[in-house]
């Protein structure tokens, strides 16, 4: 396998419980609400990284269009809800993301903190991609299947971008590969503790 394929393989070590997609379809208004706020938080996270690392030209150039894309996707989810006569609900605490944020290294150099943040974002995008794929394959509504296939493709691209940025700013590839594996191992154990919920994307 080539280095590029190895680098970009999702590598998730525990698949989502297949029952989750059916649960999500039954609670569509709740899952769309959570999805909308996931897009909003992704927008905010990209802006935050740009603010923290304004002199990292490649990061700024690559994340700037993602800010626009993520906010546009928030609006797409809202529009889809309105078409279906649904109301955006309250934002909920994302246990999955909170746990990953706690796993991030906060001490050390700014470069180490940046690499860890990029890897955390890459993992969130990878899991989102996997879940969007489940929805695109299992939801009965063909329009929603297409809707979530589009999001799956988008998240796959964001995952690759975040991981590639981590490699770009790291001092060596071995460090990134080792830390990425630590994230994957941590996420596997985390997934074992989180019960599938119909009102959560993660």
Language-model region placement:
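Non-heme di-metal
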Residues: 1-202
């Amino acid at each position: 396998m080539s280095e590029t394929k190895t680098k970009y393989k999702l590598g998730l070590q525990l698949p989502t419980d297949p029952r989750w997609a059916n649960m999500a379809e039954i609670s569509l208004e709740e899952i769309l609400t959570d999805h909308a706020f996931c897009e909003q938080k992704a927008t905010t996270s990209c802006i935050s990284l740009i603010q923290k690392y304004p002199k990292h030209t490649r990061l700024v150039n690559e994340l700037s269009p993602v800010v626009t894309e993520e906010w546009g996707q928030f609006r797409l989810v809202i529009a889809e809800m309105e078409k279906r006569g649904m109301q955006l609900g309250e934002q909920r605490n994302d246990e999955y993301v909170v746990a990953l944020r706690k796993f991030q290294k906060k001490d050390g150099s700014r470069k180490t903190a940046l690499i860890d943040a990029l890897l955390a974002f890459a993992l969130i995008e990878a899991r989102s991609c996997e879940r969007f794929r489940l929805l695109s394959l299992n939801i009965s509504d063909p329009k929603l299947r297409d809707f979530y296939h589009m999001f799956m493709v988008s998240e796959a691209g964001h995952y690759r971008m975040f991981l590639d940025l981590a490699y770009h700013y790291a001092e060596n590839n071995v460090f990134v590969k080792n830390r990425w594996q630590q994230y994957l191992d941590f996420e596997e154990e985390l997934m074992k503790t989180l019960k599938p919920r119909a009102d959560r994307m993660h």
